[in-house]
């Protein structure tokens, strides 16, 4: 199974599920994520979330999201790392960054990602104007096998990149724990492949993690291929038929956004789970409950 198994079945870097959008490119990070205090922009909020990655009950890596929010602007840095025997064999590592503006969904203006295994690597850079792709470069270029579904120009408008896809702006001005904040479609484009991730509300749970104690929204997830995929590949059909995927969303203090607390994805090798081990914030409201009550 791959780090990209969540939304990009064609890649085979061992370690399914790296945080929704980043999973799309089979990402890992060159250095193990360590808890650190995020630096909030003046008048804004920042958060760092550290994760453990498990496959079929075995720990295989770590991941980290770092987000900064100031007014309508955001920046997202995402990384992950394969550890133990899997990491020693594959050498998987990488990092991604996105920046843009927040509206009903993230409107990215720039995205970049670089990944590497022991025997290969890939880099993607995209320039966008409020979520509309103006340029995308992949190094090395993908090999055209002649069986990929084309990505239309229309499909490259109003998209979110893999890193921005992790960021869920709250709907309206209501409670951040409103179940309606689950219900959304993420139109993801990773530079080569266009797909939708459809989220729907399942339930609300209470969690207690270092740095965060409070409600999380449990959202079911479905994958829908749009373009750039190879429809005859078994992995594509597996993911489109996969009904055993979910994400837990937690509110970010001082910002009207939610980030993943936990992601679970069934794969052909077992269930992959990415779960937060630490939630570190700066700026914004002093407590999660105060932030929720303020809105």
Where are these regions (language model features)?
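Bacterial N-terminal signal peptides
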Residues: 15-26
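Acidic, serine/threonine-rich low-complexity disordered tracts
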Residues: 34-130, 174-295
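Bacterial N-terminal signal peptides that target proteins for export
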Residues: 3-17
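Short, aromatic- and cysteine-enriched interfacial helices/patches
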Residues: 3-7, 25-27, 85-90
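A charged, solvent-exposed segment within the mature domains of Sec-exported extracytoplasmic proteins
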Residues: 131-196
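Sec/Tat signal peptide C-region and signal peptidase I cleavage site
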Residues: 29-33
């Amino acid at each position: 199974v791959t780090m990209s198994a969540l939304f990009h079945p064609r890649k085979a870097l061992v370690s399914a599920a790296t945080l929704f959008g980043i999973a799309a490119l089979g990402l890992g990070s060159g250095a193990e994520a360590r808890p650190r205090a995020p630096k909030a922009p003046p008048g804004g909020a920042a958060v760092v979330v550290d994760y453990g990655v498990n496959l079929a009950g075995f720990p295989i890596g770590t991941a980290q999201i770092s987000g900064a929010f100031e007014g309508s602007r955001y920046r997202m840095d995402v990384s992950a790392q394969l550890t133990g025997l899997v990491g020693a064999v594959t050498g998987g590592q990488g990092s991604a960054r996105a920046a843009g503006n927040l509206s009903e969904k993230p409107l990215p203006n720039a995205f970049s990602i670089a990944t590497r295994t022991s025997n290969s690597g890939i880099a993607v850079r995209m320039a966008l104007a409020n979520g509309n792709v103006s340029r995308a470069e992949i190094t090395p270029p993908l090999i055209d096998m002649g069986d990929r579904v084309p990505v239309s120009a229309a499909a490259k408008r109003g998209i979110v990149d893999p890193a921005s896809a992790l960021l869920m702006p709250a709907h309206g001005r209501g409670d951040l724990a409103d179940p309606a904040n689950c219900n959304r479609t993420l139109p993801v484009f990773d530079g080569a492949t266009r797909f939708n991730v459809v989220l729907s509300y399942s339930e609300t749970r209470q969690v207690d993690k270092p740095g965060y104690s409070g409600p999380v929204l449990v959202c079911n997830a479905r994958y829908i291929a749009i373009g750039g995929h190879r429809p005859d590949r078994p992995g594509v059909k597996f993911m489109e038929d996969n009904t055993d995927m979910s994400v837990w969303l937690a509110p970010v203090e001082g910002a009207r956004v939610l980030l993943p607390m936990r992601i679970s994805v069934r794969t052909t090798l077992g269930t992959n789970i990415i779960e937060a081990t630490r939630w570190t914030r700066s700026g914004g409201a002093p407590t999660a409950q105060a932030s929720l009550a303020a809105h």
